[in-house]
Amino acid sequence: MDWHSFRIAALLLTSLVVLEVNSEFQIQVRDHNAKNGTIKWHSIRRQKREWIKFAAACREGEDNSKRNPIAKIHSDCAANQPVTYRISGVGIDQPPYGIFIINQKTGEINITSIVDREVTPFFIIYCRALNAQGQDLENPLELRVRVMDINDNPPVFSMTTFLGQIEENSNANTLVMKLNATDADEPNNLNSMIAFKIIRQEPSDSPMFTINRKTGEIRTMNNFLDREQYSQYSLVVRGSDRDGGADGMSAESECSITILDVNDNIPYLEQSSYDITIEENTLHSQLLQIRVIDLDEEFSDNWKAIIFFISGNEGNWFEIEMNERTNVGTLKVVKPLDYEAVKNLQLCIGVRNVAEFHQSIISQYRLTVTLITVTVLNVVKGCVFQPGSKTFIVDSRMEANHTVGEFLATDCETGQATNKFKNVRYRYVMGNNPENLLVVDSGIITLRNRVTMEQYERLNKRYEGTVLSIHDSLQRTCTGTIIMVLCGFWTTTEHPTTSTEKPVTLSITPNVDNVHFGPAGIGLLIMGFLVLGLVPFLLISCDCGGAPGGGAGFEPVPECSDGAIHTWAVEGPQPGGITTICVPQMPPGNANVIEYIDNSGVYTNEYCGREMQDLGGGERTTGFELMDGVKTSAAPEICQEYSGTLRRNSMRECRDGGLNMNFMESYFCQKAYAYADEDEGRPSNDCLLIYDIEGVGSPAGSVGCCSFIEDLDESFLDTLGPKFKKLADISLGKEIDSYPDPDPSWPPQSTEPICPQHMEQLASGHPSISPHFGKTTVISENAYPSGPGVQHPMLIPDPLGYGNITVRESYTTSGTLKPSVHFHDNQQASNVVVTERVVGPISGADLHGMLEIPALRDGTNVIVTERVIAPGSSLPNSLTIPNPRETSNVVVTERVIQPTSGMIGNLSIPP
């Protein structure tokens, strides 16, 4: 292989690619954000050299026209065709306008005016190359023109005067404040770099502060700040750009620093000692003024002082009250001094501030004791009554000038009574003397007059006056209080009685036993409490209403909701929508009325009281009355018109609950009647139909099951109900036989048997019952719901001797049919029409046990059109549906047995 030829071919191919492809390339630069960890890619495009001539930088504030052209653009397309160059952007067609212009032929860009970097730090010029038609020949080009900064802006402080404060005695290098200044020149440039400097301090004794030239932080230079010497400093700070260079621009600002006060001065008293004198037995509110000197800030807690006693005031004779406005303490005498007890006192006092001392002097503080010498002056005293008051008792027998008692004053110097002194004359006079009752002479108190009843009442049984002892030479006086209790003023002589009662003589035997609460009474009280404590134990141990011989306890009361009312899955219409209930009439002849009426099950929901008694193993119910319908009684009664035993009501089941099961039977009978009445309003066979022939419809409408009817057979018309037959007869003009009223009013007023309201003893047999019952009977439903638990099959006898019976519907629905249920139909029935029978439990369990539907017995004229058994689940046991036997004139339109729940036991539905 010729490698030389291959290299030449490769070079030629590369040249062609370079010529054809646009001569530009992109460089992506990765920008990593350290804060959130993201990476961004920026595209940098390199233009071809022929398209751009790099723009020259422009200096702000100068005439840059001498540098024109500052840039030149050129396109390679100009070699083949004429090219027009145009520019746009800020400074061209956007404000500020007209700064840049371009030569459209040559592509030279010129600057025409002075620029300001603080207004526009750089310009972006968009360049375009256009052909004669105005179309772009090249991609638009961005041309950046940078404006060079000059130092044309001085620093600017954010505040004219900065305010700061600091505590006195602060440590060195403690931060006071921080200054803030800005420069409008280009950031991170020497022109915007500011240096701070303190150029003046007032007072200027010694420099106290220093400033960081870069950050502007002002700090203390030493710990010699003293508010008591200078409370405020003023600084002048200069900020210069270009890092404080001589060619930089500068600005100045003031700083005012306030020195805060601390408790760094120990207070002291104006004098080191005090001497005072005071007379004995005197009180003084301003005995001495003590001034406190403190150099801290006035009216602050550092300045306010507290003067306290160190010693000498053990008797609490003195107090010191401080004046917070003047910081002066006043010494007061609050308790008299006795010269005989204390002649001289040495009071030691100290002083401190309200606030704690500062840490700088707390170690230097020493308690300074100031001495106050108190001299007590002796004063010649007079006399005093000891005690100050005296009580006397005065009764009505005391006459005038009667001596009540003696009340003498005592000399304070000697402590003797005043009547002991011969050369000193004390005299006594009465001060306050109510009713002017007493007279005093040399301390002897006598009655001026006898106390009368009026005085006694005005004084309210008590006299209170004063007596004065006066020393004339010393002019001393003392006062004593005299109290007299007045008693014995209710006598027979002063207040004669008008009572006619005889006087009662009482004798008091001394030295008898004490009448107060003694040990025997306390013992009885304790025994009473013990007996009360035994009562709860006796109540617990006693037989509270239990049966004799049985243990204590409570008899459980069953709940009605679970005892008698079951949870039924099928709910019929409300009782308000039930039509009139038809009660079947009595059968002819001397039939067993008990079985007949017991099987009818006609009840209502309203009762008027109930009483049940046990009668020799049986059950008797009295007072059982229906508000609507036939009045019944559960005991055998004797009817006047019919023979046999008539039992109007019977209780087949009495469960533990409080609801009679006969009421439940009546309730479901009414529900069944409601279903039958509802069925009258819709066509016969209006139910779910099952077709066995796939793809063939039902001719003449869905009137029944056509599984065994041939095509185009009209025998299905025979299965129509009586209403349709009657309609057909009317259409053909035949004679219409009236049908019995399905809802006759029952019972007739004339045929209702009158039963006695009292019970009679039946000797033998029963009175005969006249055949007063009709042949036409409508039975709505025979429903016997079974309760939970295993029970024996319950046979429900059918009424005998029916004729022309129409059975509307028979439903047996229950949540779970555990026991066996047996349904009996009419015996020896003729002309029977059964419209529908459905045996279908609600739930979806299996049918356990045997489902049996016996055939009709002794029936004639019976036509069975369809019997369908469609269980919803598996039938583990046998399912038997026998054929009708001995039937006559009976039309059974449909029977559907479709269980969907578990049925445990035997389900027997006779035809």
From Swiss-Prot:
Topological category with respect to the lipid bilayer: Single-pass type I membrane protein
Desmoglein repeat repeat start-end pairs: 783-809, 810-839, 840-869, 870-897, 898-911
Keywords carried by this UniProt record: Calcium, Cell adhesion, Cell junction, Cell membrane, Cleavage on pair of basic residues, Cytoplasm, Glycoprotein, Membrane, Metal-binding, Nucleus, Repeat, Signal, Transmembrane, Transmembrane helix
Predominant location category: membrane
Residue ranges crossing the lipid bilayer per the database entry: 520-540
Extracellular-facing ranges: 50-519
Name this polypeptide is given: Desmoglein-1-gamma
Native source organism of the sequence: Mus musculus (Mouse)
Origin organism lineage: Eukaryota, Metazoa, Chordata, Craniata, Vertebrata
